[in-house]
């Protein structure tokens, strides 16, 4: 991936899983965005095993990765998807000293979403929450986030 070894240990705070299982949930029209716009390597975009992900992390000295279970927009709207928490929980089991889970938040879910967040923390050992407010066309301090 790179010829230059990073000597500084890194914690990557927002990591999207690229496993085949996780990619099944993403809309198929994202290829151009990931590969052309943000220059994701084609091999990475096509999917990695957990072990392949750990190998890439080793290559650039990423010691820990906070894996997000994103909630991209409200379900039912075009382009929206939610990655089930269980998929991230399964990844954490592969290397719990390096993978940590962040539960995606959908502010339109209200108290049901709060209960899901609580379950992710208590049952799956997630360490926190993650949100993309722009996918909901809300500011981060919108009142819909208050229950969380």
Descriptions of predicted regions:
Residues 1-70, 75-79:
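An N-terminally biased module of ancient metal coordination in phosphate/nucleic-acid-related enzymes
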Residues 63-64, 71-148:
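Active-site gating/metal-coordination segments in enzymes
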